[in-house]
Design a protein with these regions (language model features):
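Flexible extramembrane loops and terminal tails that flank transmembrane helices
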Residues: 34-45, 110-114, 181, 185-190
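Helix-loop-helix units of permease transmembrane domains in multi-pass membrane transporters
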Residues: 23-53
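Secretory targeting signals
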Residues: 2-6, 11, 52-112
Length: 190
């Protein structure tokens, strides 16, 4: 299971921006965003709906990898079920964070390729933060490490559920969804 939990976040660095690049950018490019703005839904409801659609797709892809777990169980491998469940939960949270960043990137532009590039840049920065600690002043090292997605995922992949990790994931998701909503509201009135 450790190999799956090590490689999946790397795949997510490009897969999730590809999934989320068209969430809002396609609506803008096709001109349907004006129609959506006239509907009786609030901007945050629209953003949340787009975000949840991408998270659903990510979780569906994650469910397919359960075949790996069931195969290991069938061949008699000794599996720590707590760590496996926490690892899958952590992968879902990492996917949710990256999807929120991708949703924000998609709201910034009407070009899907540009949205993809912005999203890849954002998620790579969040993934690399704890790997760049040697370049950071000692006083900032703890903060920079705490901002890294990989730092929090590593705890979950080992089977450790810490409230700090859950608060981190919820905060980053909320932050990007808030930015997306505000960005769309500003552009709505332009």
């Amino acid at each position: 299971m450790r190999a799956l939990f090590n490689i999946t976040p790397l795949v997510y660095l490009f897969f999730i921006p590809a999934v989320s690049m068209s969430l809002v950018a396609r609506e803008k490019n096709l001109g349907t965003i004006e129609l959506i703005n006239t509907l009786p839904i609030k901007t945050h409801e629209f953003v949340l709906g787009k975000y949840l659609a991408s998270v659903t797709l990510i979780v569906a892809g994650l469910v397919i990898t359960l075949v790996h777990l069931f195969t290991l169980i069938q061949v008699g491998t000794n599996i720590d079920y707590g760590a496996a469940i926490c690892g899958y939960f952590g992968l879902a949270l990492v996917g949710a964070v990256y999807a929120s960043a991708g949703t924000f990137a998609s709201s910034v532009t009407d070009n899907q390729v540009v949205a993809f590039i912005i999203a890849v840049f954002i998620v790579i920065v969040f993934w690399l933060l704890d790997k760049m600690l040697i370049f950071v002043p000692v006083g900032l090292a703890g903060f920079v490490q705490f901002m890294s997605v990989d730092y929090h995922f590593t705890n979950l992949s080992r089977g450790v559920i810490d409230s700090r990790n859950l608060i981190y994931f919820a905060s980053v998701i909320g932050f990007f969804l808030f930015l997306t909503t505000k960005n769309m509201e500003v552009k709505k009135w332009k």
